[in-house]
Amino acid sequence: MAIIIDPIADMFVRMKNAISRKYYEVTLPHSAKKVKILEIFKKEGYISDFEVLTNEKSTFKEIKITLKYKGMNQNQSAISGIKRVSKPGLKVYSSSEKLPRVLSGFGTAIISTSKGLLTDKEARKANVGGEVIAFIW
């Protein structure tokens, strides 16, 4: 098993690869931060669902993500793009006044704040800044 330096970026890459291959499900290693990010994705309508899987034979948990497709033939992903902003080597922070707007408000920024993980809209409403984790549109 390989060591993953940035598990959030790994999750995004797995999702992008699954979308490019038109897969409906993708499985990845579990972490609490990934679950919080996926809760935001589900709430904002970027994925259909996700669930945490436990295996009796192993102590490792996994997350199964059900991707969301739209359009006449259900062939266009609800996710057009994902960008990891703050990385382990370069953290990006933003004050509440300077929170980024993704595609003039049509996308979502995920912000890690003192109140937990929030979307850019929720962080503006709560008047808190924090680490800019990712953009999704």
From Swiss-Prot:
Gene Ontology CC terms: ribonucleoprotein complex; ribosome
Parts of the chain that traverse the membrane: none
BP term (GO), one: translation
InterPro entries attached to this UniProt entry: Ribosomal_uS8, Ribosomal_uS8_CS, Ribosomal_uS8_sf
Keywords: Ribonucleoprotein, Ribosomal protein, RNA-binding, rRNA-binding
The organism's place on the tree of life at top rank: Bacteria
Pfam family, one: Ribosomal_S8
Molecular function, one GO term: structural constituent of ribosome
Entry function: One of the primary rRNA binding proteins, it binds directly to 16S rRNA central domain where it helps coordinate assembly of the platform of the 30S subunit.
HAMAP family in UniProt: Ribosomal_uS8_B
Assembly with partners or alone: Part of the 30S ribosomal subunit. Contacts proteins S5 and S12.
Family: Belongs to the universal ribosomal protein uS8 family.
NCBIfam families: PRK00136.1
Name by which UniProt lists this protein: Small ribosomal subunit protein uS8
Organism: Metamycoplasma arthritidis (strain 158L3-1)
Record lineage: Bacteria, Bacillati, Mycoplasmatota, Mycoplasmoidales, Metamycoplasmataceae
